[in-house]
Amino acid sequence: MLKSTILVAVADIKGGVGKTTTAMLIAGCLARRGEHVTVLDADNTGGATLWDEYVRIEDDRRRKEDEANGTPHKPYKLGFDVIQTNDVILGMPDRIRERYKGWVIIDTPPSDAGTVQTALQAADVSIIPC
């Protein structure tokens, strides 16, 4: 487990290159290793936030199915929090470090150079899918 907070920006100005998928898969892998992970969804389309909601809906569906079948419910969850954010928050990396511990994965939007630049400046590590 980390003793500090590491900010990781998954960024590219181009859309459709897999930023959200990359961010969520990295977060999932780290969470499965027992790391504390938070995804900050700075993408105005809310892809990571929607992903989180889809998992919640699927968990509810499975719970109802398990109840109907009389079987124990095994929770279906991401294993980390997804928080909607914006460039103002990203511009305060010290506040992010105070609030969130472990790994903070930042999912950035396409076609918003300002938010992408702010995320890259805040990050300790940048991943640019292509």
Q: Would you name each region that the model predicts?
A:
Residues 2, 7-17, 24, 29-105, ...:
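P-loop/Walker-type NTP enzyme "switch/lid" segment
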Residues 21-22, 26, 118, 122:
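Residues within well-formed alpha-helices
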Residues 113-130:
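Inter-motif core of Ras-like GTPase G domains
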